Amino acid sequence: MKFKLTYILIFVLLVSCKQNKLDAATDFKSKRVSEYIYSSESDSDPINENWVKEDSLFLSELTDILKNDESDILDILKIDESDRRTTLGFGYEQIEASMGKGYAGIYYNLILKDGQVASYEFTPNFPNNKDIKERYLKMFSGIFKISDNTLHKRYFNISEMEKPLKNINPDISLNENLRFLMTPFSGTRYGFSGGYSGSTFTNRAIFIEESKSINPEVCQILMNSINSGTRLMGIEYYMKNKSDFKNQDLINNWIDKVYSELPTIETLEGCFVMQRDSKALVAEYVKRKN
């Protein structure tokens, strides 16, 4: 069957359980999540050269575009007003989808600011049939860094996504984990876990891992994140540790602004994607012990 990428809810819910062409190894110590390349035995079906040609044309065109202007990707990815967008607040939107032609393709996590490309994350979907592995490595080499049998995700302008919305506490330096938590690429849902396997959200896992690194100064930076889920986790921390904060009036005003910018946020309840009232959901997590 011809491979055709479609980023739908089923994929979101099953991603933690799938045994697919690429296994992801996530190291929270690095924002450069890697994809390991595996080769299976030869497929019993003959190679469809038309699919290979379609992949080659698409990946070659994308390579040329990226060499000229890394932000000029809307047309080739066929992004328009009909695409499902997640509102992050403060003029930012997120589009998570995919583009593929034959055996392979690219998952993209695109961030728009006032309708313009601000940043993105590209994840390769690489065919594991050994008969075409070398041909596809060459096709992907112009888009993704390849080293030690590993395809690395590609990021555009990620450093801007690591910055707070306001220039708050500029003397505070965040570690690599917390910088990645600031970006939408760590996941923009707010909550704890979900899906068929009950996996902890990536942003929540990082937040827990870095809990000892979070203090009032760092928390205020997190509350100013472009990432809507991270903002709410910052508010959650503040609500649980109010006595540690000195400038509560300013913080409370900012929290009101955050809620007005994003009255509702996406979460998972079991296997179901839900849109919940942001303020009410934070209040629920403030009451939780974990």
Language-model features and meaning:
Residues 13-16:
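C-terminal motif of bacterial Sec signal peptides marking the signal peptidase cleavage site
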Residues 22-217, 222-229, 238-241, 248-290:
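Extended repeat-based scaffolds of very large eukaryotic assembly and lipid-transport proteins
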